[in-house]
Protein backbone atom coordinates (compact mmCIF):
# COMPACT_ATOMS: atom_id res chain seq x y z
CA UNK A 1 0.00 0.00 0.00
CA UNK A 2 2.74 2.46 0.87
CA UNK A 3 4.62 1.61 -2.32
CA UNK A 4 1.49 2.58 -4.31
CA UNK A 5 1.28 5.94 -2.53
CA UNK A 6 4.94 6.67 -3.25
CA UNK A 7 4.37 5.94 -6.94
CA UNK A 8 1.33 8.23 -7.00
CA UNK A 9 3.26 11.11 -5.42
CA UNK A 10 6.21 10.52 -7.73
CA UNK A 11 3.92 10.40 -10.78
CA UNK A 12 2.10 13.61 -9.89
CA UNK A 13 5.32 15.45 -9.30
CA UNK A 14 6.51 14.98 -12.86
CA UNK A 15 3.20 15.50 -14.70
CA UNK A 16 2.38 18.98 -13.43
CA UNK A 17 1.77 21.61 -16.11
CA UNK A 18 2.86 25.22 -15.81
CA UNK A 19 1.66 28.33 -17.61
CA UNK A 20 3.82 31.44 -17.62
CA UNK A 21 6.37 32.49 -15.04
CA UNK A 22 6.00 31.11 -11.50
CA UNK A 23 5.17 33.52 -8.69
CA UNK A 24 8.12 34.29 -6.42
CA UNK A 25 6.23 35.57 -3.37
CA UNK A 26 2.79 36.35 -1.96
CA UNK A 27 2.99 39.98 -3.07
CA UNK A 28 3.20 38.90 -6.72
CA UNK A 29 0.15 36.68 -6.27
CA UNK A 30 -1.83 39.55 -4.72
CA UNK A 31 -0.70 41.91 -7.47
CA UNK A 32 -1.77 39.40 -10.13
CA UNK A 33 -5.18 38.87 -8.55
CA UNK A 34 -5.74 42.62 -8.17
CA UNK A 35 -5.54 43.18 -11.93
CA UNK A 36 -8.83 43.91 -13.63
CA UNK A 37 -9.96 41.09 -15.91
CA UNK A 38 -12.74 40.65 -18.41
CA UNK A 39 -15.52 38.19 -18.36
CA UNK A 40 -16.76 36.89 -21.70
CA UNK A 41 -20.33 37.23 -20.42
CA UNK A 42 -19.75 40.90 -19.63
CA UNK A 43 -18.39 41.49 -23.10
CA UNK A 44 -21.08 39.65 -25.01
CA UNK A 45 -24.10 40.22 -22.80
CA UNK A 46 -23.27 43.49 -21.10
CA UNK A 47 -24.05 47.04 -22.08
CA UNK A 48 -22.34 46.69 -25.47
CA UNK A 49 -25.07 44.40 -26.77
CA UNK A 50 -27.50 47.23 -26.10
CA UNK A 51 -25.18 49.64 -27.92
CA UNK A 52 -25.02 47.31 -30.91
CA UNK A 53 -28.80 47.07 -30.89
CA UNK A 54 -29.05 50.88 -30.83
CA UNK A 55 -26.57 51.14 -33.69
CA UNK A 56 -28.85 48.97 -35.73
CA UNK A 57 -29.62 45.30 -35.90
CA UNK A 58 -29.13 44.06 -39.44
CA UNK A 59 -32.34 43.59 -41.37
CA UNK A 60 -33.35 40.23 -42.79
CA UNK A 61 -32.43 41.46 -46.26
CA UNK A 62 -28.93 42.44 -45.05
CA UNK A 63 -28.51 39.04 -43.40
CA UNK A 64 -29.56 37.33 -46.63
CA UNK A 65 -27.03 39.40 -48.59
CA UNK A 66 -24.26 38.58 -46.10
CA UNK A 67 -25.06 34.88 -46.28
CA UNK A 68 -25.05 34.99 -50.08
CA UNK A 69 -21.76 36.94 -50.09
CA UNK A 70 -20.18 34.27 -47.88
CA UNK A 71 -21.60 31.50 -50.12
CA UNK A 72 -23.73 30.10 -47.30
CA UNK A 73 -27.16 28.61 -48.04
CA UNK A 74 -29.79 31.35 -47.87
CA UNK A 75 -33.01 29.36 -48.33
CA UNK A 76 -32.83 27.21 -45.20
CA UNK A 77 -31.00 29.75 -43.02
CA UNK A 78 -32.23 30.65 -39.54
CA UNK A 79 -32.24 34.43 -39.99
CA UNK A 80 -33.11 35.29 -36.39
CA UNK A 81 -30.21 33.22 -35.09
CA UNK A 82 -27.90 34.80 -37.66
CA UNK A 83 -29.01 38.27 -36.57
CA UNK A 84 -28.33 37.42 -32.93
CA UNK A 85 -24.86 36.10 -33.76
CA UNK A 86 -24.07 39.24 -35.80
CA UNK A 87 -25.07 41.52 -32.91
CA UNK A 88 -22.82 39.54 -30.55
CA UNK A 89 -19.91 39.74 -32.98
CA UNK A 90 -20.39 43.48 -33.50
CA UNK A 91 -20.53 44.13 -29.76
CA UNK A 92 -17.35 42.10 -29.23
CA UNK A 93 -15.55 43.98 -32.01
CA UNK A 94 -16.73 47.31 -30.58
CA UNK A 95 -15.40 46.32 -27.17
CA UNK A 96 -12.02 45.40 -28.65
CA UNK A 97 -11.83 48.73 -30.50
CA UNK A 98 -12.66 50.69 -27.34
CA UNK A 99 -9.97 48.99 -25.27
CA UNK A 100 -6.66 50.79 -25.07
CA UNK A 101 -3.63 48.52 -24.86
CA UNK A 102 -0.91 51.06 -25.66
CA UNK A 103 -0.04 51.57 -21.98
CA UNK A 104 0.16 47.84 -21.38
CA UNK A 105 2.32 47.10 -24.45
CA UNK A 106 5.35 48.79 -22.90
CA UNK A 107 5.54 46.26 -20.07
CA UNK A 108 4.60 43.12 -21.99
CA UNK A 109 7.06 40.33 -22.51
CA UNK A 110 6.15 39.04 -25.96
CA UNK A 111 7.14 35.51 -25.01
CA UNK A 112 4.17 35.39 -22.64
CA UNK A 113 1.79 37.82 -24.32
CA UNK A 114 0.99 36.46 -27.77
CA UNK A 115 1.13 33.39 -29.90
CA UNK A 116 1.49 35.42 -33.09
CA UNK A 117 4.08 38.12 -33.80
CA UNK A 118 3.01 41.71 -33.25
CA UNK A 119 4.68 43.10 -36.38
CA UNK A 120 3.69 41.29 -39.54
CA UNK A 121 5.05 41.59 -43.06
CA UNK A 122 2.61 43.20 -45.49
CA UNK A 123 0.96 40.73 -47.85
CA UNK A 124 1.36 41.12 -51.59
CA UNK A 125 -1.13 40.06 -54.22
CA UNK A 126 0.97 36.98 -55.00
CA UNK A 127 1.07 36.05 -51.29
CA UNK A 128 -2.73 36.30 -51.16
CA UNK A 129 -3.08 34.07 -54.22
CA UNK A 130 -0.83 31.45 -52.61
CA UNK A 131 -2.86 31.55 -49.39
CA UNK A 132 -6.14 31.32 -51.30
CA UNK A 133 -4.90 28.27 -53.21
CA UNK A 134 -4.22 26.53 -49.89
CA UNK A 135 -7.67 27.21 -48.40
CA UNK A 136 -10.06 24.27 -48.23
CA UNK A 137 -13.76 24.97 -47.93
CA UNK A 138 -15.54 23.43 -44.99
CA UNK A 139 -18.71 21.52 -45.86
CA UNK A 140 -19.75 21.57 -42.18
CA UNK A 141 -20.24 25.35 -42.31
CA UNK A 142 -22.27 25.18 -45.51
CA UNK A 143 -19.54 26.18 -47.95
CA UNK A 144 -20.10 24.26 -51.18
CA UNK A 145 -16.86 23.31 -52.91
CA UNK A 146 -15.92 25.63 -55.76
CA UNK A 147 -18.74 28.07 -54.98
CA UNK A 148 -16.74 31.28 -55.07
CA UNK A 149 -13.43 32.38 -56.54
CA UNK A 150 -12.35 35.48 -54.61
CA UNK A 151 -9.95 36.73 -57.26
CA UNK A 152 -11.74 35.46 -60.35
CA UNK A 153 -13.38 38.79 -61.18
CA UNK A 154 -10.25 40.93 -60.68
CA UNK A 155 -9.00 41.30 -64.26
CA UNK A 156 -6.89 44.44 -63.93
CA UNK A 157 -4.38 45.77 -61.42
CA UNK A 158 -3.43 49.43 -61.10
CA UNK A 159 -1.60 51.20 -58.24
CA UNK A 160 -2.09 48.18 -55.95
CA UNK A 161 -5.86 48.27 -56.55
CA UNK A 162 -7.66 45.43 -58.25
CA UNK A 163 -10.35 46.42 -60.72
CA UNK A 164 -13.52 44.36 -61.11
CA UNK A 165 -15.58 45.23 -64.16
CA UNK A 166 -18.11 42.42 -64.29
CA UNK A 167 -20.22 40.10 -62.21
CA UNK A 168 -20.84 42.15 -59.08
CA UNK A 169 -23.07 44.77 -60.69
CA UNK A 170 -25.84 42.43 -61.89
CA UNK A 171 -28.48 43.15 -59.22
CA UNK A 172 -27.87 46.89 -58.73
CA UNK A 173 -30.63 49.47 -59.22
UniProtKB/Swiss-Prot annotation:
A cellular component term, taken from the record's GO annotations: mitochondrial inner membrane
Organism domain of life: Eukaryota
GO molecular function: ATP binding; glutaminyl-tRNA synthase (glutamine-hydrolyzing) activity
Membrane topology, record value: Peripheral membrane protein
GO biological process per UniProt: glutaminyl-tRNAGln biosynthesis via transamidation; mitochondrial translation
Reactions listed under catalytic activity: L-glutamyl-tRNA(Gln) + L-glutamine + ATP + H2O = L-glutaminyl-tRNA(Gln) + L-glutamate + ADP + phosphate + H(+)
Cellular location(s): Mitochondrion inner membrane
Keywords, in A-Z order: ATP-binding, Ligase, Membrane, Mitochondrion, Mitochondrion inner membrane, Nucleotide-binding, Protein biosynthesis, Transit peptide
Transit peptide: 1-15
Enzyme Commission numbers on file: 6.3.5.-
Family to which the UniProt record says this protein belongs: Belongs to the GatF family.
Assembly behavior: Subunit of the heterotrimeric GatFAB amidotransferase (AdT) complex, composed of A, B and F subunits.
Role noted for this protein: Allows the formation of correctly charged Gln-tRNA(Gln) through the transamidation of misacylated Glu-tRNA(Gln) in the mitochondria. The reaction takes place in the presence of glutamine and ATP through an activated gamma-phospho-Glu-tRNA(Gln). Required for proper protein synthesis within the mitochondrion.
Name of the protein described by the UniProt record: Glutamyl-tRNA(Gln) amidotransferase subunit F, mitochondrial
Organism: Candida glabrata (strain ATCC 2001 / BCRC 20586 / JCM 3761 / NBRC 0622 / NRRL Y-65 / CBS 138) (Yeast)
